[in-house]
Amino acid sequence: MDFSSLVASQLNAGVIWPEGILIITLMVILIGDLIVGRSARSWLPYVAIAGLLAAVVALYFTWDNPKPVAFLGAFEGDNLSIVFRAIIALSTASTVLMSIRYVEQAGTSLAEFLAIMLTATLGGMFLSGASELVMIFISLEMLSISSYLMTGYMKRDPRSNEAALKYLLIGASSSAIFLYGVSLLYGLSGGETSLSAIAQKLTDVNGGQSLALAIALVFVIAGIAFKISAVPFHQWTPDVYEGSPTPVVAFLSVGSKAAGFALAIRLLVTVFGLVSEQWRFIFIALAILSMILGNVVALAQTSMKRMLAYSSIGQAGFVMIGLTAGTDAGYSSMIFYLLIYLFMNLGAFACVILFALRTGTDQIAEYSGLYQKDPLLTLCLSICLLSLGGIPPLAGFFGKIYLFWAGWQAGLYALVLVGLVTSVASIYYYIRVVKMMVVKEPQEMSDAVKNYPVINWTLTGMRPLQVGIVLSLVATSLAGILSNPLFTLATDSVTTTPILQSAALATHISRAN
């Protein structure tokens, strides 16, 4: 074997060809904007969407790859990473549809916005499969820095600037905390950076039990908890969600959060397997706090964006039930819930964006009487919100059932009961919005709705944002009907990923003892 063949076999770059498609798409957008100029606005977003969908198709063809390890072990292209990378790519494609009209109305460069968003997507996708410390940190910062830039993209809006500054300061602090935990792992393992090598070295040294390892665990969890908006590392979420451009908020609530959970699974399961009881205990506490605070504080919100911000904190708590279960059913239900959360949450944000573009407000009280002026928007928003609340037979109901059942089977009875109670509480603030939209008395109609312009929902007259809303509605509805195939997909991604099978076996043995 010659040198070039040896290098090619070691790098195995074909594993990341979905990301390669996105890199080419990013270059086309930047060069197209440079050459064509402002007239490129009409086709650049669709190039981005086409590239993202092509990346999802490429991910499909890498399923069950017999050689998933790439770049000398720095990246794992296993089925677990494929599912998370697909979630992130699909969330970005939906967000691009939402962004076109929003960015144009703000008078800022659409090409630059798309370039930053695709960079964040690349960071999230690389983070989902990263299995080496340097790769993890570079991917994490690639995602984080792009998110900071998108948050402050509307530079003429003081709220956007404030949100970006808060996000930057708190995000930089969390990155430093996470990096300190990672540096402890590097030192404890004697200079290893591969996650599997670190796990092996930690096992050889004192059986993995040491004060330094416990400190590293706490710092790493703090960094991950910031990314998934878990209480008490959630302080940035309401202010950043309220002040940021709404399409950016939609991406942060799904794409960024999915990347955070992918990192949590791979890092905690691989490196901290010997202290799995400890990190599960910490995540049980985080889940309880997130579900209670997120859903209770959401009851008092008057802004749709702040309500959805606290809702996303509560939703993160539900997802953590699957993570703490540590079983095949737990991981599968976690992935399944993120798959349907993608559709219902992005659908809700798309409706909020359209209403804000038409009325200039996101206050909940201003939605009063919307059904009389825009029945289809009311229907779409109602279905997405009720699905988030877990109302049967919508997709969110099946997602929560799977999560709660996995937690119950794992013996997490108190956690499941808290989840059930807070889920019931969340239904109130979702139904409150729905009830407000369908009031029939003209005197109860808000001023914003009274002046609501006529919207064309015909097939030929819909704008990209309206297409995104309809697609989200269809996807949310189909996710409820086709919950079994989606759950089978999630289960297959777990049962064919070696690190999760080893972790599930270890968890079963420890509980049996």
Curated annotation (Swiss-Prot):
A GO cellular component entry from the record: plasma membrane-derived thylakoid membrane
Record keyword Ribosomal protein present: no
Subcellular location(s) per record: Cellular thylakoid membrane
Pfam families: Ndh2_N, Proton_antipo_M
Catalyses which reaction(s): a plastoquinone + NADH + (n+1) H(+)(in) = a plastoquinol + NAD(+) + n H(+)(out); a plastoquinone + NADPH + (n+1) H(+)(in) = a plastoquinol + NADP(+) + n H(+)(out)
Record-annotated disulphide pairs: none
GO process terms (BP): ATP synthesis coupled electron transport; photosynthesis, light reaction
Enzyme Commission (EC) number: 7.1.1.-
The protein's enzyme class: translocase
Major subcellular site: membrane
MF term (GO), any: NADH dehydrogenase (ubiquinone) activity
Keywords: Membrane, NAD, NADP, Plastoquinone, Quinone, Thylakoid, Translocase, Transmembrane, Transmembrane helix, Transport
Domain of life: Bacteria
Membrane disposition: Multi-pass membrane protein
Transmembrane residue ranges: 15-35, 43-63, 80-100, 110-130, 133-153, 168-188, 211-231, 245-265, 281-301, 307-327, 335-355, 379-399, 401-421, 467-487
Subunit description: NDH-1 can be composed of about 15 different subunits; different subcomplexes with different compositions have been identified which probably have different functions.
Similarity comment: family membership: Belongs to the complex I subunit 2 family.
Stated role: NDH-1 shuttles electrons from an unknown electron donor, via FMN and iron-sulfur (Fe-S) centers, to quinones in the respiratory and/or the photosynthetic chain. The immediate electron acceptor for the enzyme in this species is believed to be plastoquinone. Couples the redox reaction to proton translocation, and thus conserves the redox energy in a proton gradient. Cyanobacterial NDH-1 also plays a role in inorganic carbon-concentration.
Protein name: NAD(P)H-quinone oxidoreductase subunit 2
Species lineage: Bacteria, Bacillati, Cyanobacteriota, Cyanophyceae, Oscillatoriophycideae
